[in-house]
Amino acid sequence: MPLSAQQLAAQKNLSYVLAEKLAQRILKGEYEPGTILPGEIELGEQFGVSRTAVREAVKTLTAKGMVLPRPRIGTRVMPQSNWNFLDQELLTWWMTEENFHQVIDHFLVMRICLEPQACLLAATVGTAEQKAHLNTLMAEMAALKENFRRERWIEVDMAWHEHIYEMSANPFLTSFASLFHSVYHTYFTSITSDTVIKLDLHQAIVDAIIQSDGDAAFKACQALLRSPDK
């Protein structure tokens, strides 16, 4: 008898929850690379789900490069080099409280490689309208120094950085900012206390971009990223 739409949705939800649980165990090293996962029946009994839900969960992890199912062998955990850490779900599963500092360390390396280049491009190819909007965001950041609101600062700070990526007109850089939106938010939330952060360094980037000085924008961004707390 065919499953109803509601039953299919419930099954899909169960398979996603199972995929997350299995991914967490793999990320924590409970299932090490090279090992074979328990079979469908064992996993189904262990987590209280159907074999269909297990199969769907395995498909999800396979698509992320975490496992590789093989007939008569089983589902093998793949080396970490195969895992697609640019996958939004995998990134979310990885960024637990336990792994937070590890994720942020890797994230900051990516930022210092990419964000200065985004600033350079923003200065050289950004439109007058985009530069005006960047200046508007900067003005609000400056205003928050006098009347600080933590949540609003985080929102504006994120919008400021993401707008620079958009100004670069480079689809890969724009996608990076979009993909790592949740990481940016978590990171900015963790470093923001009760005051604005490095306002002068943000302003130096804006000044360089508005003046269409790509080299100065590049160096100003490096200064921001290498300064403490940012």
UniProtKB/Swiss-Prot annotation:
SUPFAM superfamilies noted in UniProt: GntR ligand-binding domain-like, Winged helix' DNA-binding domain
Cross-referenced InterPro entries: GntR_C, TF_FadR/GntR_C, Tscrpt_reg_HTH_GntR, WH-like_DNA-bd_sf, WH_DNA-bd_sf
Domain of life, source organism: Bacteria
DNA-binding region: 40-59
GO molecular function: DNA binding; DNA-binding transcription factor activity
Entry annotated with the keyword Transcription: yes
Alphabetic keyword roster: DNA-binding, Transcription, Transcription regulation
Domain HTH gntR-type span(s) in chain numbering: 12-80
Gene3D superfamilies: GntR ligand-binding domain-like, Winged helix-like DNA-binding domain superfamily/Winged helix DNA-binding domain
Gene Ontology CC annotations of this record: cytosol
PANTHER family for the chain: GNTR FAMILY REGULATORY PROTEIN, TRANSCRIPTIONAL REGULATOR, GNTR FAMILY
Protein name as catalogued: Uncharacterized HTH-type transcriptional regulator YieP
